[in-house]
Amino acid sequence: MKATYNIQDYFLNQLRKDSVPTTVFLISGYQLRGLIKSFDNFTVILESEGKQQLIYKHAISTFAPARNVTLYEQETETEEVTR
């Protein structure tokens, strides 16, 4: 059986683990820049200039990382053949 991935959680977790500088665009148009420190189903903690901000996800429009994030590890040869 194929595993189901939650892209949002995987993406945010990679940003957090790799300490990728990220711009968070809010639906109001305001921009916040910093590092993702933690997240859950409803909030994201962003650290910028030594200060933390708790941002509600419903207020976020876009995450724009400073560099690309690898979303999935390469599949094994066996998985590719069975498709």
UniProtKB/Swiss-Prot annotation:
UniProt GO molecular function: RNA binding
Signal peptide: none
GO cellular component, one term: cytosol
CDD domains: Hfq (cd01716)
Keyword annotations of the record: RNA-binding, Stress response
PROSITE patterns found in the cross-reference section: SM (PS52002)
Family under the similarity heading: Belongs to the Hfq family.
Function: RNA chaperone that binds small regulatory RNA (sRNAs) and mRNAs to facilitate mRNA translational regulation in response to envelope stress, environmental stress and changes in metabolite concentrations. Also binds with high specificity to tRNAs.
Subunit structure: Homohexamer.
The protein's name: RNA-binding protein Hfq
Organism of derivation: Exiguobacterium sibiricum (strain DSM 17290 / CCUG 55495 / CIP 109462 / JCM 13490 / 255-15)
